[in-house]
């Protein structure tokens, strides 16, 4: 026998983000468009795009040009690289190959370098017209973890806590136990 959680007055949380917190009208239109595409096509690609577009800004990690180039190979060289975040420039990358990239935003220098190499910078509405089911598209995401996450969670020093304290220095005399006297 199972418990009827709703009857007991317990709150059952939804695991899926239903609506975006963004107030940007264009962003909301994109979500509306991809909701339509998810409903009309049986494409997992569109479901992924919709989920990532609906995620919070904190979870849209910027993707650098060097990471895009690093993930290129012979099979996906002609494909459209898709990212639901900002594409940023990387000055350590000396040459940029010809790319077709679709993203929410591009930094000014990243856009210049892609266009100078003979590539294209697409928006999501252009991608929906070009590939409504996501054929010939390669979905990329930046690494999710950030240095800031080290400090979140239980307070440092509490039992069971693995979070790092905010300290001005990490030397011998800072935030270290001096031992018993």
UniProtKB/Swiss-Prot annotation:
The gene is RPL18. It is found in: Cytoplasm. Keywords: Cytoplasm, Ribonucleoprotein, Ribosomal protein. InterPro entries: Ribosomal_eL18 (IPR000039), Ribosomal_uL15/eL18 (IPR021131), Ribosomal_uL15/eL18_sf (IPR036227). Residues 169-181 have a biased composition (Basic and acidic residues). This is Large ribosomal subunit protein eL18. The lineage of its organism: Eukaryota, Sar, Alveolata, Ciliophora, Intramacronucleata. One of its GO terms (cellular component) is cytosolic large ribosomal subunit. GO terms for molecular function: RNA binding; structural constituent of ribosome. GO terms for biological process: translation. Residues 152-181 are annotated as: Disordered. Its main location: cytoplasm. Belongs to the eukaryotic ribosomal protein eL18 family.
């Amino acid at each position: 026998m199972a418990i009827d959680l709703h009857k007991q007055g317990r709150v059952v949380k939804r695991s899926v983000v239903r609506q975006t917190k963004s107030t940007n009208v264009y962003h909301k239109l994109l979500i509306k468009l991809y909701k339509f595409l998810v409903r009309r096509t049986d494409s997992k690609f569109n479901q992924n795009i919709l989920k990532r577009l609906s995620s919070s800004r904190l979870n849209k990690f910027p993707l650098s040009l060097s990471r895009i180039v690093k993930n290129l190979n012979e099979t996906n060289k002609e494909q459209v690289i898709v990212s639901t975040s900002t594409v940023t420039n990387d000055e350590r990358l000396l040459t940029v190959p010809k790319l077709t990239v679709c993203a929410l935003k591009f930094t000014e220098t990243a856009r210049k370098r892609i266009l100078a190499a003979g590539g294209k910078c697409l928006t999501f509405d252009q991608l929906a017209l070009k590939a409504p089911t996501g054929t010939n598209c390669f979905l990329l995401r930046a690494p999710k973890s950030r240095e800031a996450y080290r400090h979140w969670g239980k307070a440092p020093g509490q039992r069971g806590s693995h979070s790092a304290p905010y300290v001005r220095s990490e030397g011998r005399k800072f935030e270290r136990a001096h031992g018993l006297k």
